[in-house]
C-alpha cells in the first residue's frame, strides 16, 4: 500500500512540476498596438456618391445628387501629426448645408457598445453641427452620414450623404 501511495505521490509531483515548467512560457505576443479609431477610418478626402433628402414627416425620399450641384460636393477631414482630428473643409458648389471650414471630432472614437450611432461633430467657431454616422469605411471605402434638421426638437428633414474616399 505504501509503495502504491508513494508511486502515486511521485507521479503527481512529477506531473505538477512539468505543468509548472511548461506553464511559464515566455511567448512574445508582440508589442501593444492601439485600436483603430473611427477618426482614423473617417479622416481623408471624401467625394459624393449620392445625396438623399428625406421628409421626416412622411418618410418620402428624393435623390438630390444630380440637382443643385451636389455632385461637386467634397469634404476634407484632416488629421494632425499625432493622428487626431483637426480641421475640415467643404468644397464644391452644392448648397451650403454644412459649415465650409473649421474643426472636427467624433463624439466617441470607437464603436459604441449600445449600438447607437456615432456622431461626427463639425465646429466652425460659431456653432457645432452634428452628423449621424450611418456607415463607416471598412472593406469598402464608403462613408455615410445624415444631417437632420429639427424645429422645436422634432426632425422635419434629413440629408443622407453617401461618400467615397478620393484617390490619394
Regions found by a protein language model. Give the residues of each.
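C-terminal motif of bacterial Sec signal peptides marking the signal peptidase cleavage site
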Residues: 19-23
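Lipid interaction determinants
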Residues: 25-99, 109-168
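Short beta-strand-centered aromatic/proline hotspots
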Residues: 102-104
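Core hydrophobic alpha-helical transmembrane segments of single-pass membrane proteins
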Residues: 13-16
